[in-house]
Curated annotation (Swiss-Prot):
Protein name in UniProt: GAS2-like protein 3
Family: Belongs to the GAS2 family.
Annotated stretches, region: Disordered: 301-683
UniProtKB keywords: Actin-binding, Cytoplasm, Cytoskeleton, Microtubule, Phosphoprotein
Source organism of this protein record: Mus musculus
Subunit structure: Interacts (via CH domain) with F-actin. Interacts (via C terminus) with microtubules. Interacts with MAPRE1.
PTM annotation (Phosphothreonine): residues: T435
Length: 683
């Protein structure tokens, strides 16, 4: 009989064995490598299943007539088809062996899906039918397994024990059981005879396992490898054939298929190596030492890793919201804006916000439209920085007179003086709370609006000034509310002058006003600021009657000329605050306005105009303005040309434009605080 090389070591042949071999000697790789020892222990547990696996594969192959390999036993059984076939074979064999009393053994037809795939639902169904049959024939629940245990190979030991129990049951009806079941019966008979006679001598019982010499040599080899160096050696004492004494225990040892040395333990079987690992005092000490070392190893790893883990793992970056805002500001300050601007910007933004609730109570006619467009504003805050400071200066110069001209429309006879006083009156009315510098921020946006309406930019791709404009519009609801709520009282001419440059039509085109248009504004509008304050007072009173402004009217009539010539910063503020008023009026034109129906909504006007159109618009604005200055009495219905007078700026506007780039930079630096301030103010 040829034996496997891994088995020959039990019979005195020295062959190198790997720890993965199921029949490796009990001492294993040693305690130096704990992980390797754990792996070896797992292999030893698998080794206890190998004898049952081989025995069952031989038994099933004989019953079913199919060659089943021990290594692939679970793969052959996991779809449940062979198990259902086993039921039919066993029932037929029970009928043939016990034709007289077949009623004791339950006979039933078990449904089976023969083409079930491994791991499929049908495989689970076949396995469930087999387990149902096992319960009917009397298999105890302790031997049964779950369907998943077989289908997914989760519990091979329980599957083997169940098959062995079926072999024990069918052996009662004359069916040949597995060899392990035969050995169990021999041992049971031997124990019964020994207990009955009370003798320790061996009783002559036919042994089907193997010859006595082979079994004894295998037991000696396993027990003495490695040699024990203890003072009180714990050895296996031979009593009789297949009977040994280990300490106070009597062991029944059998050889299975000439390869496996099996020990009868309780109601099952174990290999001699596994049994010695559990019950030999020397090996128990070895196991205890191993367990302690494993626990110490695990605790050591956990204790060492806990203090070291914070040092190994890099610290996450500190999440400081202010640092994120500072980074945002630095990225936006790349065009050359000073770093100290955001602080001033915060102050300037907070001041209008503090005054906003006082005047916002008066009305809410203009605010809905601006608030409706506010969601667009935060989308692209960083882009307004792209506009150069020169462009900002040009923007500041251009709209300063556009407001005055748009307000001058009610009185065509005295357009320049009326417009100037109108701007003065609006400035006086708005800036009386001593915050002229605070209004500088909205001034630039108003200039952006006026220039964007009448001078479509050459760089239409930059959409962000619109959003900034809307952002500041919502923050300046007070000025627009005062005029927009009372806008229906304005003359039709004023309405015709304002609806045409609808503040929200092409605001995306703001960023790059041409220098030519700026020059035109300087040339054409240098005259009106020097008009007589008398007509300015008349127009101021006219504005007071039309707009119903309470306190600033008297101030406006008295000092329009002085403020016009003296303080150009205040003129810029007046333009800034007057422009939102005109915007508010444009949003709410009077019912008598003939131009309001022709105004295009913001949602429709999305395509920016080309640079050539910008040139023509500026030229037409210039010519229209000259024509109206020459003939001071055009009808009120012919006010659309006045809308083209908005881009040119006065001398004051040019001067203020020189002063306002810093304010423009402050405006464009940080829009985060502008938006949050508006939100808080709305609450």
């Amino acid at each position: 009989m040829t034996m496997q090389p891994a088995i020959q070591v039990w019979f005195g042949e020295d062959l190198p064995l790997s720890p993965r071999c199921p029949l490796t000697p009990r001492h294993g790789p040693g305690l130096a490598d704990v992980c390797q020892y754990d792996e070896w222990i797992a292999v030893r547990h698998e080794a206890t299943l190998l004898p049952m696996q081989e025995d069952l594969s031989i038994w099933l192959s004989g019953l079913l007539g199919v060659d089943i390999k021990a290594e692939r036993l679970l793969e052959e059984l996991d779809n449940g088809v062979l198990l259902c076939q086993l039921i039919n074979v066993l029932q037929n064999m029970v009928k043939g062996c016990h034709s007289d009393e077949p009623g004791n053994f339950p006979m039933r037809k078990v449904p089976c899906k023969k083409d079930a795939a491994s791991g499929s639902f049908f495989a689970r169904d076949n396995t469930a039918n087999f387990l149902h049959w096992c319960r009917h024939i009397g298999v105890d629940e302790t031997y049964l397994f779950e369907s998943e245990g077989l289908v997914l190979h989760k519990d091979p030991r329980q599957v083997y024990l169940c098959l062995l129990e079926i072999g024990r049951i069918v052996s009662r009806y004359g069916v040949e059981p597995p060899v392990l079941v035969k050995l169990e019966k021999e041992i049971e008979l031997e124990e019964t005879l020994l207990n009955a006679s009370g003798l320790e001598e061996s009783i002559s019982i036919p042994k089907s396992c193997c010859q006595q010499e082979e079994l004894h040599e295998a037991v000696k080899h396993i027990a003495e490898d490695p040699p024990c160096s203890c003072s009180h050696r714990f050895s296996i004492e031979y009593l009789s054939e297949g009977r040994y004494r280990l300490g106070e225990k009597i062991l029944f040892i059998r050889m299975l298929h000439g390869k496996h040395v099996m020990v009868r333990v309780g109601g099952g079987w174990d290999t001699l190596q596994g049994f010695l690992l559990k019950y030999d005092p020397c090996r128990i000490l070895q196991f205890a030492t191993l367990e302690q070392k494993i626990l110490a190893f695990q605790k050591g790893v956990s204790n060492e890793s806990v203090p070291d883990s914070p040092a190994r793992t890099p610290k996450p970056p500190e999440m400081n919201p202010l640092s994120a805002v500072n980074m945002f500001q630095k990225q936006n300050l790349r065009p050359g804006t000073p770093v100290s601007v955001p602080k001033n910007k915060e102050k300037q933004v907070r001041l209008p916000g503090a005054r906003l609730p006082a005047s916002s109570v008066k009305g809410n006619l203009a605010s809905p439209s601006t608030r409706a467009k506010r969601p667009d504003s935060p989308a692209s805050f960083p882009h307004p920085k792209v506009t150069s400071l020169k462009d900002a200066a040009k923007k500041t110069t251009a709209p300063s007179n556009s407001v005055s001209q748009s307000l001058a429309s009610p009185n065509p006879g005295s357009k320049p003086s009326t417009a100037q006083c109108a701007s003065e009156s609006s400035r006086k009315c708005v800036t009386f709370p001593k915050t002229a510098q605070t209004k500088a921020i909205p001034a630039q946006n108003s200039r952006d609006l006026s220039k964007s309406r009448l001078l479509p930019s050459k760089s239409p791709g930059k959409m962000e000034p619109k959003h900034l404009k809307h952002n500041h519009l919502s923050s300046r609801d007070e000025s627009r509310i005062n005029l927009s709520s009372k806008s229906p009282k304005l003359p039709k001419g004023a309405m015709h002058g304002r609806p045409n440059p609808s503040p929200f039509q092409p605001p995306a085109k703001v960023t790059k006003p041409s220098s030519k248009t700026g020059a035109i504004g300087l040339g054409t509008q240098s005259q009106p600021p020097t008009r007589t304050p008398r007509s300015g007072a008349v127009s101021a009173q006219r504005l007071q009657s039309t707009l119903n402004l309470n306190s600033p009217a008297s101030v406006c009539s008295g000092s329009s000329a002085k403020a016009t010539q003296g303080s150009k910063g205040k003129n810029t503020v007046s333009v800034a605050k007057k422009q939102p008023q005109s915007k508010g009026v444009c949003r709410n034109p009077g019912p008598g306005s003939s131009k309001s129906p022709g105004r295009t909504p913001l949602s429709i006007v999305t395509v920016p105009q080309s640079a050539t159109k910008t040139e023509t618009v500026s030229k037409s604005a210039k010519t229209a303005m000259k024509g109206q200055y020459s003939a001071k009495g055009p009808p009120k219905s012919s006010k659309p040309p006045t809308s083209f007078r908005d881009p040119p700026s006065s001398g004051k506007g040019a001067d203020s434009g020189d002063k306002m780039p810093t304010a423009r930079k402050k405006e464009e630096d940080d829009h985060y605080f502008v938006m949050t301030g508006n939100k808080k103010l709305r609450k």
